[in-house]
């Protein structure tokens, strides 16, 4: 989890924000998934947020559900996902790698075993999307035992108690929700969340990255101007994959261009 701290220190010294793309591992196939990750890094991604496909994704909108179905159709299994993660870590030793997933996948092998496996392949953080802070003890304790950062979602309506808990338990970064609901680029990010960001800073929370509905450079710029340490974009990236399934070269080029544009918005003016 030290990779996040090193990244944020490096970016702060340059007065930059972080741009973090999300993709589902195995979409559209394990082999193409690794090429897609290369394109994201070449485009300038500061860190990666990766999903392990799951049959019942509660927080995902239609775009990411389609990605999950494509990954399943290509035969992607959790074991293969861990092989991909090990390959990505080997290729990019300093890049923070986060997982975004659901509790059933953590439970399937035992919570401690899951985090041990994450640590073994070089995963820096895990966000379990369907586990609220008040039920997170077994997850965050296992994560900390294995030096994996437990990531918590800060919703737009978080009260003071929740903000204090997130600040106390979270490591790596804080996933700041632009709005309630499911993911999707078609649901644009709401206005910057200055109040929450100020409170998280006051309580010494891990740096906030704003996610949900980030699909254009202006939104990245607005998030950083509001005090976020950066932005996460998922559905807009997965949409590019979906729209170019029949043309691999165009897909990789479009992904690179998109990341380059959103990363550029994180640079000082």
Swiss-Prot record:
Do you know which CDD domains this protein is assigned to? Tryptophan_synthase_alpha (cd04724)
Name the GO cellular-component terms.
Answer: cytosol
Concerning PROSITE patterns, the annotation shows: TRP_SYNTHASE_ALPHA
Molecular function terms in GO for this entry? tryptophan synthase activity
Q: Which UniProt keywords apply?
A: Amino-acid biosynthesis, Aromatic amino acid biosynthesis, Lyase, Tryptophan biosynthesis
Active-site residues are 49 (proton acceptor), 60 (proton acceptor)
An example Pfam family from this entry, by short name, is Trp_syntA
- Write out the catalysed reaction: (1S,2R)-1-C-(indol-3-yl)glycerol 3-phosphate + L-serine = D-glyceraldehyde 3-phosphate + L-tryptophan + H2O
Q: Which InterPro entries match?
A: Aldolase_TIM, RibuloseP-bd_barrel, Trp_synthase_alpha_AS, Trp_synthase_suA
EC no. given is 4.2.1.20
Record flagged with keyword Amino-acid biosynthesis: yes
Q: May I ask which residue range the UniProt record assigns to the signal sequence? A: none
Pathway the protein acts in: Amino-acid biosynthesis; L-tryptophan biosynthesis; L-tryptophan from chorismate: step 5/5
Which domain of life does the UniProt lineage start with?
Bacteria
The protein's matches in HAMAP family, at most eight in alphabetical order, are given as: Trp_synth_alpha
Subunit structure of this chain's protein:
Tetramer of two alpha and two beta chains.
**What PANTHER family does UniProt report for this protein, alphabetically?**
TRYPTOPHAN SYNTHASE ALPHA CHAIN, CHLOROPLASTIC, TRYPTOPHAN SYNTHASE, ALPHA CHAIN
Q: What does this protein do?
A: The alpha subunit is responsible for the aldol cleavage of indoleglycerol phosphate to indole and glyceraldehyde 3-phosphate.
- Similarity field: Belongs to the TrpA family.
Protein name per the record: Tryptophan synthase alpha chain
């Amino acid at each position: 989890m030290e990779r996040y701290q090193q990244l944020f220190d490096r970016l702060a010294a340059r007065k930059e924000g972080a741009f973090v793309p999300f993709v589902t591992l195995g979409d559209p196939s394990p082999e193409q998934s690794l090429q897609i990750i290369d394109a994201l890094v070449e485009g300038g991604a500061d860190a990666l947020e990766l999903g392990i496909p799951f049959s019942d994704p509660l927080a995902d909108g239609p775009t990411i559900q389609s990605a999950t179905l494509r990954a399943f159709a290509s035969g992607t299994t959790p074991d293969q996902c861990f092989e991909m993660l090990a390959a990505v870590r080997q290729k990019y030793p300093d890049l923070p790698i986060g997982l975004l997933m659901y509790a059933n996948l953590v439970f399937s092998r035992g919570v401690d075993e899951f985090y041990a496996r994450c640590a073994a392949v070089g995963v820096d953080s895990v966000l379990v999307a369907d586990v609220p802070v008040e039920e997170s003890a077994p997850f965050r304790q296992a994560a900390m035992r294995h030096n994996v950062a437990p990531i918590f979602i800060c919703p737009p309506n978080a009260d003071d108690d929740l903000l204090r808990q997130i600040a106390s338990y979270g490591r790596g970064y804080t996933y700041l929700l632009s709005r309630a609901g499911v993911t999707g680029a078609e649901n644009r990010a709401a206005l910057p969340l200055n109040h929450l960001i100020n409170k998280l800073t006051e309580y010494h929370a891990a740096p906030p990255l704003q996610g949900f509905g980030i699909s254009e450079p202006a939104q990245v710029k607005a998030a950083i101007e509001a005090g976020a340490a950066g932005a996460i974009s998922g559905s807009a990236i997965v949409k590019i994959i979906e729209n170019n399934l029949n043309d691999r070269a165009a897909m990789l080029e479009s992904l690179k261009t998109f990341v380059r544009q959103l990363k550029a918005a994180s640079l000082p003016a």
